[in-house]
Amino acid sequence: MSELLSFALFLASVLIYAWKAGRNTWWFAATLTVLGLFVVLNITLFASDYFTGDGINDAVLYTLTNSLTGAGVSKYILPGIGIVLGLAAVFGALGWILRRRRHHPHHFGYSLLALLLALGSVDASPAFRQITELVKSQSRDGDPDFAAYYKEPSKTIPDPKLNLVYIYGESLERTYFDNEAFPDLTPELGALKNEGLDFSHTQQLPGTDYTIAGMVASQCGIPLFAPFEGNASASVSSFFPQNICLGDIMKNSGYQNYFVQGANLRFAGKDVFLKSHGFDHLYGSEELKSVVADPHYRNDWGFYDDTVLDEAWKKFEELSRSGQRFSLFTLTVDTHHPDGFISRTCNRKKYDFDGKPNQSFSAVSCSQENIATFINKIKASPWFKDTVIVVSSDHLAMNNTAWKYLNKQDRNNLFFVIRGDKPQQETLAVKRNTMDNGATVLDILGGDNYLGLGRSSLSGQSMSEIFLNIKEKTLAWKPDIIRLWKFPKEMKEFTIDQQKNMIAFSGSHFRLPLLLRVSDKRVEPLPESEYSAPLRFQLADFAPRDNFVWVDRCYKMAQLWAPELALSTDWCVSQGQLGGQQIVQHVDKAIWKGKTAFKDTVIDMARYKGNVDTLKIVDNDIRYKADSFIFNVAGAPEEVKQFSGISRPESWGRWSNAQLGDEVKIEYKHPLPKKFDLVITAKAYGNNASRPIPVRVGNEEQTLVLGNEVTTTTLHFDNPTDADTLVIVPPEPVSTNEGNILGHSPRKLGIGMVEIKVVEREG
């Protein structure tokens, strides 16, 4: 209803101003600004819905000021361009309509009415209401009743007898199991669900709506609210260090806790969270690649579900035979948005909906088959009688190709339990949420029936039942939950450990690189993650007087304040204010100690603008002084005009990437020398090794042969035509996720370049 009212007010404002208000520059600008705000808010809501499937939620506040990178980002480029073009077109059309009668005399009354209607349209819009509520949640002091509802359980289970297998299905919400809405989509896993305790109304709350947040909520009984964006949790050294979570209790009770997934454990700090709370045995893409049957059988995120669940079964067998009490947690990935992935071993590879194939539904049907196969192996084993199997979604599905169909249904998270010791078949329609999952499992295992804000759905009362406005209540508790991190409020001295790549201050430890905004009573960490912008882009969003400490590779800050370090990949510390003074210090000891030294200086806005503009220069446009192309730093030498076909810098250098261009092409500002030696330090990837690699300058071509290890080769060129471009053509680029950023499409690697140098020859 509010959408219709908001749009009606918007339309009325446009029509009244266009036909009655007349000519006045101030009223035109004011009305266009407010109407433009209405458009921006609603496009933001549309874009947020596209990415999150949940409107402008808590995570979007962070994303509004940072780049969205990571999972399948290329899939979102076209919609993003469409939004920008649409926004420009709407603004242009809006301005044209409002100025239709600009030659008529100004009418104050109609101008005022149009402006008031425009303001009303903004106030009534759902986007404005959502943003207002989120901003309020950032500034609240907390809710006094938090302590009454947050309950710490006993640290042990008195007489543990059951092993636990806990399966997180990526985005595998219960809605998919509605056979009337989606016929024969989940027959195998749906049949198993119907054999156990099926909790049919598991609500998703703020702070539980992405993978690491869903894991924290289900194991600790609290939403993931932090002094930083949740998916950047990989930079912290401990995770809710004071809280008692399910893994802690199980470890204290004699369990060995295992976690197996196909993606990199570092993503979003899963490794930090699990190690902080009782898990000593973790297996992700790096740990599994040496043990899986086919280490090259991977999707954009890591190993496919069939591979991961096969490894989980092997681990279940091994642990069961040992007689050791254990828990085995696993997380699938094939159903990750926007499209999902199809394992090669499943029978259900294709699912049609609305008369055409749907990739997301196909991925769901395949993944549920793999999960069901894993569960049936456990059920058929002699150890099932001592095992509790839990299957849950980590969160509701985000915007995938099935999302518009899911939204037509009553959406809930998946949570069901199959007990080998005491088979129970029942559908429980009690109102609950993700935070109740851990407490319910703890209750089944013989422990307490509460865990944080979670309550057992078998013997307790969920917060979702106690509070009708549970979403608003959860946001009201946000400051209380953030305080559980015991995060420092000041930063005066700090220590950098180069061996561990960590910074420590005021009792807290963070992984490097790191950017910190430091104020009188708050230290705000801004880590670099797969979902955040590079730190220099985040720093560019700081206000002129904001105090910052930035710890990163020297070359990243050298172009601003320390050109002598432009080629250094060591750690450096920069601190100061963008509109004031900045200093850069080279970290030259294994254990390096520093102090903050912020000066209250006069702000220079010209300096501020120059710093911001320089920080926002994209990597390929950065230039440095050097007599060769050094590939392990961003940018290129000043003599290079442009280059293509080259991937991002890594610690050793850069790969060629045929996804960015079939050839490595380096164009210089001036013609290359008439006679020169080309000194190439490089290696080959895969089948490109020991094969002739054409290297061209103008009409002359030489052959380069590389091995899998780095070597230096000198090629001799004559350049009578004054060519200015160097071209290298890898013979057989290989599609691979090796060394790739998690969630990005595979790169096509050919040669790995460390350094290229042009040396003019005499004569």
From Swiss-Prot:
Annotated GO MF terms: phosphatidylglycerol-membrane-oligosaccharide glycerophosphotransferase activity
The keyword Membrane is annotated on this UniProt entry: yes
Superkingdom field: Bacteria
Any single Gene Ontology cellular-component annotation: plasma membrane
EC top class named in words: transferase
Keywords from the named record: Cell inner membrane, Cell membrane, Membrane, Transferase, Transmembrane, Transmembrane helix
Function: Transfers a phosphoglycerol residue from phosphatidylglycerol to the membrane-bound nascent glucan backbones.
Record-given protein name: Phosphoglycerol transferase I
